[in-house]
């Protein structure tokens, strides 16, 4: 599965693919940055519903988009994270800068 974007009410939702690695990272971040700038996105949501694997380039995508959104006065969320994805996000330090929401918390 490839990634996809969904826009609405100043929010950009990135449905992260099953595997986010260096093969997709560059394309995903370029497209996300373009959408953030074009639509003045204030909330970026990474949806990990389908994600089973993410390497350091995937972490880089999240961190880079966080910096971009933060400079615009916005925020970044992660939703639908599995236990495995929460471990990856915790170990990488991502959870110190973005919010993780579970079903029904948003």
Question: Can you name each region flagged by the protein language model?
Answer:
Residues 1-52, 67-106:
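STAS-like cytosolic regulatory interaction modules
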Residues 62-66:
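Histidine-anchored nucleotide/phosphate-binding helix
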């Amino acid at each position: 599965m490839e990634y996809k974007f969904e826009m609405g009410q100043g929010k950009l939702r990135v449905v992260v693919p099953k595997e986010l690695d260096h093969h997709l990272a560059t394309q995903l971040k370029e497209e996300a940055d373009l959408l953030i700038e074009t639509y003045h996105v204030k909330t970026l949501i990474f949806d990990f519903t389908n994600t089973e694997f993410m390497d350091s380039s995937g972490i880089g995508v999240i961190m880079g988009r966080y910096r971009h959104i933060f400079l615009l006065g916005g925020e970044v969320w992660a939703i639908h994270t599995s236990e495995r994805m929460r471990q990856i996000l915790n170990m990488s330090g991502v959870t110190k800068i973005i919010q993780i929401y579970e079903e029904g918390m948003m």
